[in-house]
Design a protein with these regions (language model features):
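Short N-terminal strand-loop motif that marks the start
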Residues: 1-66, 400-424
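NAD(P)H dinucleotide-binding glycine-rich loop of Rossmann-like/cofactor-binding domains
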Residues: 95-177
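C-terminal hydrophobic helical "lid"/dimerization subdomain
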Residues: 162, 243-248, 269-276, 320-424
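Adenosine-nucleotide cofactor-binding segment
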Residues: 175-176, 181, 192-270, 393
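Hydrophobic/small residue at the entry helix of a nucleotide-binding pocket
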Residues: 186-187, 214
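Rossmann-fold NAD(P)-binding glycine/threonine-rich loop
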Residues: 269-272, 276, 288-308
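Helix-to-beta-strand junctions that scaffold the AdoMet/dcAdoMet cofactor pocket
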Residues: 278-280
Length: 424
């Protein structure tokens, strides 16, 4: 099977590659990858090349496919797997394999990654339960289940304690105060959505950022009124220009501090502020992954000793987290499409990945069978003045107030002849 992929060849070197995949073994799957959402972790891998802990050596001869937030259709089933998988079955990938090597789809494999028209899912991933059935018809929601899974995993990884009881109570504190720092970006939107609509029921959620445009968009998508209807006080705060942001944020809790603080940017000042915001028994979740292996920030160990403050760090999520993300998206309880601001084809991946931190907006969604520059949804109408493709896409997203949706996805895929039925 001939495939077209975006692959890492070295530091800051991502290219489109076309080649013949080998035949699958009796314990492998050949799949068509319909969609993949671009993760900042992919930029980190492309930035570092083989110096990244998950990226192997010899990229020049064995480049690795980028992308891991993907969904698609099974095309061919190895003969030992026919009792479990069927041709034409839709799937979503759980990329958190948990291997001692750290190897994972989108970082480590020449034939296994989300930015590909076709890929081979290896036996190790299948045995680890990484291929999850997807019964929906909206591929974007399936791709976005992976970032939502990471968000859910972070909420589940937080913990709290009782003095002299040597068992952790997992999860955020029920009825507690949550602070979401640097959290009005694409992943932040998902974190706010889950805090309000995921059933965890905090009493107060404070969303902090220094980008007013992002905060305005977050307020529009997840309004204060919606949270209030669920008994949750939602507060958006721009700390830019504040002389003492930690003090002003603590004042929102009458000085008590926050039970759970999530850090969504690997910025020393943000991490230091997170430490300052912790209540007694407060849990700081360092969600953002730094590129610097020597990233160090001062921490108040007086509070660790006397106030039982503590830190966790999370990367990825469990299969259970992924299943929860899929289920909550399917019922409409969560809206992962809120995170999407740009759409593009496979040809757009190299530039998108290499410049990701500099591209404004939220998640960038790639359709591998499509040829299309990365385009902001807000630009569809303007481009539609001269291009009928964008004219119709603009009309379709207008139905959902500028949010990417299944109708728009189906139209786009149809224009490029992408098979979303039983792939052949």
């Amino acid at each position: 099977m001939k495939t077209k992929v975006a692959a890492i060849y070295g530091k800051r070197d991502v290219r489109i590659r076309e080649f013949e995949l080998p035949d699958i073994t009796e314990n492998e799957l050949l799949v068509s990858v319909i969609s993949d959402s671009v993760c900042l972790s992919t930029w980190k891998a492309a930035l570092l090349g083989s110096e990244h802990k998950r990226v192997p050596d010899d990229l020049e001869n064995h480049p690795v496919i980028t992308g891991h937030e993907c969904a698609g259709i099974i095309v061919e089933v190895g003969k030992n797997l026919t009792d479990k998988y069927k041709k034409g079955q839709r799937f979503v990938l759980q990329p958190a394999m948990g291997l001692p090597s750290g190897y994972s789809a989108g970082y480590s494999y020449e034939y296994f990654g989300g930015n590909a028209t076709y890929m081979i899912i290896p036996e190790v991933a299948i045995n680890l339960g990484c291929v999850l059935p997807y019964h929906g018809s909206y591929f974007a929601a399936a791709s976005l289940a992976e970032p939502m899974c990471c968000i859910i995993g972070a909420y589940n990884a937080n913990y709290h304690t009782t003095p002299y009881v040597y068992e952790h109570r997992m999860g955020v504190k029920p009825g507690g105060n949550i602070a979401l720092l640097a959290c009005a970006g694409p992943m932040g939107i998902g974190a706010i959505d889950y805090a309000i609509n995921g059933g965890i029921q905090p009493s107060r959620v404070v969303v902090v950022d220094i980008d007013e445009a992002r905060l305005t968009q977050a307020k529009k998508l997840l309004p204060v009124k919606q949270a209030a209807e669920k008994g949750i006080e939602l507060i958006y705060v721009n700390t830019a220009g504040m002389a003492d942001p930690a003090a002003q944020l603590r004042a929102l809790t009458d000085g008590a501090g926050f039970d759970d603080v999530f850090v969504y940017a690997a910025v020393p000042s943000v991490v230091e502020m997170a430490d300052d915001l912790l209540a007694e028994d407060g849990c700081l979740n360092f969600f953002a992954g730094p590129t610097d292996s020597q990233f160090k920030v001062p921490f108040n160990f007086y509070n660790v000793h006397y106030n039982s403050t503590h830190v966790v760090g999370t990367s990825g999520g469990s299969t259970g987290d992924m299943k929860e993300a899929i289920a909550l998206s399917a019922t409409g309880q969560l809206q992962p499409s809120f995170m999407v601001t740009h759409i593009g084809g496979l040809d757009a991946v190299p530039d998108t990945v290499l410049n990701l931190p500099d591209i404004a907006g939220g998640k960038k969604l790639i359709y591998n069978g499509v040829t299309m520059p990365l385009t902001a949804i807000t630009d569809f109408a303007e481009k539609g003045k001269t291009d009928p493709l964008f004219r119709e896409l603009a009309r379709l997203v207008e139905e959902t107030h500028g949010i990417w949706n299944e109708k728009a996805e189906r139209y786009l895929l149809a224009q490029f002849g992408v098979d979303i039925g039983e792939a052949a």
